[in-house]
Amino acid sequence: MGCRFLLVFVFICANVLTAADKPEQVYRITYVQKSNEWYKNQAALWEKVLLQDKSNEEAWMNFYKAQRYVKFNDDGHIVENRQKRLDGIITEMKKHIPDTYTYFYLSALNAKHVNEIDIGSLENAHNRWPEHAEILYELILFNEVKGDKDKVIHYARELYASEDIARGLLEYNANMLLSTQPGSILFTNGDNDTYPALVLQKACLFREDVTVINVHMAFGNREYLAKLLEEHNMKIMPHQLSKTNIADFLGEFVNMFSEKYPDKTIYMAATLNKEYIDLFQENLYLVGLVYQYSRTRMDNFIVLKENVQKNLRLDYLSRDWYNEKYPATPLVRHLNQNFIVIYMNLAEYLAEKGDIGEAQYYQNRALQLANQSDNQKMIQKIKESQF
């Protein structure tokens, strides 16, 4: 793999906080992450609120989210029958708060598959309570999979106008897209490297040439994948790909696609699960916030240098516009640690070329980001690098 500074790319880690005695707001886990113990504690606290008032929408919202994000029991084993438990919460909500935004939204969120979403109820909820931006993610997801491009654009514009997506996430996704060549394929992993990218493309007409494929959406919706590729004048047979697991599916897709379209470049977002990245380890080359797939050896450091110095938008990394209390600040700072890998690989490359001054410049930029996130292990590793 074309990557010298061997720090693992990060997605999002949990923040461990001491459990409070009073219930706190439970944010979407893609926006703010807490420890498993924190979610268990909040679920118990919000349940107490519901025992006093079963018509409390805020309590239902936070209770459901907390229960949804509890992944492990006290003994450390994965929670069993989790979906059954969540289904039970939705059933209780239908009894106590049936004609409410909270019930309609969480019913959609609880769907086990996008095809099970009651789109009529979802749209009705949005029309009646348009101030709630979080429902827009489900509306974009449903219409993206169903292929209703006009509605995707409409809701993407609404989401952009709402400013619900943290500015740092938009900047990160913009740089992810800017790391790719025109007309390429980009595989993404989750909400934070997919929704902001789609919003930039659909609402801001930014790098629309890139075909963004969320691996989980594509694996579970083969018709959607086929239509998405056809929109960009590409055609393969996704139904022939593995239905066993995502890793096999992705490996077969890359082989099939690169055989049929050798002139199209495939990229893997740095935020992809390590399991998927490891599949192609010998054929992936770091060129920015993405890995470029290539069957032949390439000098990726020339591309990396060009991207960093000419193509990427990096000013925001040294200017933190939000204070510590902004909910998404820890998430954005943690995600921005991926730039450390970029800077340190570039620094080592420049040092080998004899450009010590420029190498130290990028080393210092990496150190600045590590200090922002207070990652002591990474700070030490950067300081140990001698240029």
Model-predicted regions and their roles:
Residues M1-E24:
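Bacterial Sec-dependent N-terminal signal peptides
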Residues A20-P182, L200-F387:
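ER/secretory pathway lumenal C-terminal domains and tails of membrane proteins involved
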Residues E171, D191-N192:
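Short beta->alpha linker loops
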Residues F187-D191, V215:
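Short His-Asn-centered micro-motif
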Residues Y195-V199:
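Phosphate- and divalent-cation-binding pockets in alpha/beta enzyme and binding domains
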